[in-house]
């Protein structure tokens, strides 16, 4: 996969991290570190967290800063993003608490082509139809030159996909408490159109362990009602917030299991 972008070191609020796209990374940093879009009340001091769609690792780094005893299982299928994720974990001494896997999550194991955007790596997707629509909207709102700059140079790369429950059984066989799987305190899903497939890859034995879920969805995709129905069926209370920067486009679904 030929990609020319060289990761750039960024210093922000006592956090150093490498970024493939500085503008995109700063936007994501603001969402997570300033706007606290993933803050969940009442997490324990040592939460077990699944980061589906880890990108360059900003969410995992934020959670390790907030919860130093956290154990995080992070998934990132894009090779370039995974390499930068690994560098960022090492740079911030987070390797001991975060296990990063170079694969994506889905409802079934296999291999699929990922559309990778060098200038917007966080938008890389298994569902390119969604990004085609976003590109068309960017042309209308900002002009073709800007849209081409953001979405241009896309390449296809085959990536490995696994089911979350299969991975949990592999690393935490039999759900033994001494191996850290008494509970899954937070399942964060930000996978650019494949959110429902990720959730379908969780078996009932593991849904019973999940306390909180946060899912980002793109409204025009039409899958939000299906995601909410699945989570409600699993016993969660649902709330939904619109993204301030694009309230008619993106929603953040928060699902909490009541004790």
Curated annotation (Swiss-Prot):
GO terms for biological process: antibiotic biosynthetic process; methylation. It is an enzyme of class 2 (transferase). Pathway: Antibiotic biosynthesis. The keyword Transferase applies. InterPro entries: FkbM_mtfrase, SAM-dependent_MTase, SAM-dependent_MTases_sf. Its EC number is 2.1.1.-. It comes from the Eukaryota. Keywords: Antibiotic biosynthesis, Methyltransferase, Transferase. Belongs to the FkbM methyltransferase family. PANTHER family: EXPRESSED PROTEIN, METHYLTRANSFERASE, FKBM FAMILY PROTEIN. Methyltransferase; part of the gene cluster that mediates the biosynthesis of sordarin and hypoxysordarin, glycoside antibiotics with a unique tetracyclic diterpene aglycone structure. First, the geranylgeranyl diphosphate synthase sdnC constructs GGDP from farnesyl diphosphate and isopentenyl diphosphate. The diterpene cyclase sdnA then catalyzes the cyclization of GGDP to afford cycloaraneosene. This is Methyltransferase sdnD. It comes from Sordaria araneosa.
């Amino acid at each position: 996969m030929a990609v020319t972008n060289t990761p750039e070191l960024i210093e922000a609020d006592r956090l150093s991290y490498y970024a493939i796209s500085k503008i995109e990374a700063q936007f994501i940093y603001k969402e997570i570190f300033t706007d606290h879009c993933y803050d969940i009340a009442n997490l324990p001091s040592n939460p077990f967290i699944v980061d589906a769609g880890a990108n360059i690792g900003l969410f995992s780094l934020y959670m390790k800063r907030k919860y130093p005893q956290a154990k995080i299982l992070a998934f990132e299928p894009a090779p370039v993003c995974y390499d930068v994720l690994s560098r960022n974990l090492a740079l911030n001494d987070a390797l001991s608490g975060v296990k990063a896997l170079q694969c994506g999550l889905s409802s079934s194991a296999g291999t699929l082509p990922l559309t990778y955007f060098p200038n917007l790596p966080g938008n890389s997707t298994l569902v390119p139809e969604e990004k085609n629509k976003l590109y068309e909207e960017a042309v209308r709102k900002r002009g073709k030159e800007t849209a081409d700059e953001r979405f241009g140079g896309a390449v296809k790369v085959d990536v490995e996909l696994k089911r979350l429950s299969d991975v949990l059984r592999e690393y935490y066989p039999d759900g033994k408490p001494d191996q850290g799987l008494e509970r899954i305190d937070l399942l964060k899903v930000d996978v650019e159109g494949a959110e429902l497939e990720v959730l379908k890859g969780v078996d009932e034995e593991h849904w019973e362990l999940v306390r909180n879920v946060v899912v980002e969805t793109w409204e025009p995709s039409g899958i939000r009602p299906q995601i909410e129905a699945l989570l409600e069926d699993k016993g969660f209370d649902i709330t939904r917030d619109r993204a301030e920067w694009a309230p008619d486009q993106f929603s953040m679904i928060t699902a909490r299991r009541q004790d």
